[in-house]
Amino acid sequence: MEKRKNKTHRLRFAAKNKETWNFIKSGKKKVETRAGTVKYQKVQKGDTLILCCGKNHLQKNVKKVTHFKTLTTLFKKYSPNTIHPGIGTTKSMIAQYHSFPGYEEKIKTFGILAFELE
């Protein structure tokens, strides 16, 4: 069986989410999450993420990918502060996810993916 070559995936951050991008850059944020849509289902352990916020870019390798059916199961494994440093509570984190247009429905349909970053 032929070994899969690691791939590169581009993840974009809106300018209003620059703080999140900065947390990743500084190493404070080690888990990035995305709704488990087809686009993100392709990301696997060993792949490289190019994280873009405006003209700023950085690369992180994916150490582990985990798919969760619900936010509740996500928070059983990862605390909200691991996903977004300083967010505080699970309730605040859920409110943040639901603030993104269409995200609540995407999570209900596709679940949510957690990418552990090196």
Give names to the regions the model predicted.
Residues 75-118:
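Contiguous surface segments at macromolecular interaction interfaces
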Residues 68-75:
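Short, solvent-exposed beta-strand-terminating loops
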Residues 22, 35, 39-40, 59-61, ...:
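Catalytic phosphate/metal-binding cores of nucleic-acid and nucleotide-processing enzymes, i.e., regions
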Residues 1-43:
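Compositionally biased, charged N-terminal/linker segments
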Residues 10-12, 59, 112-116:
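Ordered hydrophobic segments in well-structured contexts
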Residues 57-67:
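Short beta-strand-centered aromatic/proline hotspots
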Residues 32, 51-52:
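A generic structural signal for residues embedded in beta-strands
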